[in-house]
Amino acid sequence: MSSIPISQEGYRLMKKELENLKKQRPEVSEAIRLAREEGDLRENGGYHAARERQGMMEARINFIEGRIARYNVIDMKALGGEKISFGATVELEDVESGEKKRYTLLGPDETGFCKGSVSILSPVGLALLGKTPGDDVVIMVPRGRVEYEILSIEFNGPAIDVTE
């Protein structure tokens, strides 16, 4: 089983999601119990909805617990260097159109928390890893092949875009 890189903030948010899901267990169990009391389960929409919710919730809990066991928590403040790696914020310019893009490379489980991030395991992330400013990189995207020039690399940590 290979490890999965994640920032300290991403790890904290995943642990918080797990904690919140576990807190919902009694509520879902109570909804199932109350629906059972209504009688015939074959035509009991409330019962089936509560069981479905319970199944999805337990699947997500199992997924997160499995991932947490594999996480390699990375201190974003300790990152740096001249080459693109986990935690780098990269500015790119489309060689053809001149359009500029900015991405932060993070682990696959935290890109949803961080606006402007891509997974290091995505086609974009994999194409950028190990490159330096001035390098050109070809990335396959849904619209085809796009060539970018790497303009700059920064290691400032992710801008987690979440409200708590």
Predicted regions: what is each one?
Residues 45-78, 82:
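Internal alpha/beta loop-helix hairpins
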Residues 5-10, 64-66, 102:
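Short amphipathic alpha-helical segments, especially helix-boundary/capping motifs
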Residues 1-6, 71, 116, 121:
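Short, exposed beta-strand "edge-strand" segments with a Pro/Gly-rich flavor and a Y/T-containing core
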